[in-house]
Amino acid sequence: MKILLLAGNTIRSNSYAQYLVSNSFKIEGLFYGFHEIEYEAPQLNYETKHFFIKSDLMLPDLEMGIEKVFDNHGRKYHHVEEHDVNSKNIINQIQAMGPDLVIFSGYGGQILKKEHFDLNIPYLHMHPGDIPSEKGSTTIYYSILNRKSCTVTAFLMNEKIDAGDIISKRIYCPPTRNVNIDQYYDNIIRANCLIDALNAISQKRDIVSFPLKDKSLEYYIIHPVLKNLSILSLDNL
């Protein structure tokens, strides 16, 4: 299976790349917007490091840029000097590369348009919520408040937001107090679920379609007070 990582210059893309090469997946990269967005490695504090050691989840070296990750493991990548993921240049490049599967890891707020799906190539996305019941933004914090756990859903995208055929779901223990949720926890649990999803695809596990009558709630960017309450609800390490 020929896998393409369609990636912006983000911590999530870097996390995906390191999980993919660590699990020996043969991938190519199509990197876009790197000329506009500079990568900044996040600080790693004690609580974050020890949480992932205790959880037995691989902690990527986010000091290393994604290009270095690809170079070190002999993976090919191409750059497109476009920030708009829906640009004709990017879509034409994807078509020319001819992947069997695209892993989408774009910039925040970007939504793929119809032209991507007209390529008839499946696009895989990892959503930090229990689809179809938890859609939208900052669902991790709502999950912590509502159920004291976090789910990642891997699904094949379509033109609807946070909708498509479900490939895999993984439930994770919530982070402990002072773990870096936005930069480490969110991206690492998504990367971990990505590997499970690719294994599911290769093993031809059953795909679950979304219910026709979707009664899910749409979550929007969480209010700072609610976000703080969810953080305060976390246990100490």
Where are these regions (language model features)?
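One-carbon transfer enzymes
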Residues: 1-237
